[in-house]
Amino acid sequence: MFKRVLLKLSGEFLSGPAPDGSAGFGISPDTTAQLARLITDALTGTNVELAIVIGGGNLWRGARNGKGMDAATADYIGMLGTVMNAMALQDAMEAAGQPTRVMTAIQMAAVAEPYIRRRAIRHLEKGRVVIFGGGNGAPFFTTDTTATLRALEIGADVVLMAKNKVDGVYDSDPRKNPDARRLDSLTHIEVVERRLEVMDATALTLCMDKGLPIVVFDLFQPGNLRRLLEGERVGTLIESERRPERLSHDPSSHVPR
């Protein structure tokens, strides 16, 4: 069983799907409440300390929304979006009975605590979920990199990369290859060499250099998060040394990465 974990969430988890099935926009109170209950229920009764980094793609994507804008400014807007998401998730999790703290890399004392590493660890030790917002305080870095950085700073055992309808990493795109197989175990260097889509290169390099494991899994498969927190193997595990590999070939689980 893990002692302390960092859960990386997509901002789109708060929006729900659009009518055409594509990723939605904004924050849906109902969808956010469902996500908060899912996380809270999985955590209840365990002794696992949980920190969360959430993206802001449901509110702002610099490459799309910031065309013609200074790149740093576009990134700062996106970082503010992650704070909005963090506050929405905090409200929903506390309504579900889970004490939380939002800590931001950009100081905004009226709405959240400034990020201080030792204080974040103390919150975790007291059983509070810590939600990190505002990226790492600097432009040109993704929330994947923020998740890796915060995980290393707080001494997390693993980064859990939560996905929706994606149950792990495949050896090829299952949307194009019906014989695609899910890889249960990989090393960091194999992810780099095979150009598998797990996280951005900066984040992956940090994990590889520091030996930080990554798990890619489907958050919305019932029971998955609880099983992970209890130490079971779920999804794809990426670590420094490869364990005996098991390949999954289940047509019902062929979902795109």
UniProtKB/Swiss-Prot annotation:
One of its GO terms (molecular function) is UMP kinase activity. Pathway: Pyrimidine metabolism; CTP biosynthesis via de novo pathway; UDP from UMP (UMPK route): step 1/1. Keywords: Allosteric enzyme, ATP-binding, Cytoplasm, Kinase, Nucleotide-binding, Pyrimidine biosynthesis, Transferase. It is found in: Cytoplasm. GO terms for cellular component: cytoplasm. UMP binds at G56, D75, N136, G137, A138, P139, F140, F141, T142, T143. Transmembrane segments: none annotated. Coiled coil: none annotated. Residues 21-26 are annotated as: Involved in allosteric activation by GTP. One of its GO terms (biological process) is 'de novo' CTP biosynthetic process. Allosterically activated by GTP. Inhibited by UTP. Gene3D superfamilies: Acetylglutamate kinase-like. ATP binds at K8, L9, S10, G11, G57, R61, N164, Y170, D173. Homohexamer. Belongs to the UMP kinase family. NCBIfam families: pyrH_bact. Catalyzes the reversible phosphorylation of UMP to UDP. This is Uridylate kinase. It comes from Deinococcus geothermalis (strain DSM 11300 / CIP 105573 / AG-3a). The gene is pyrH.
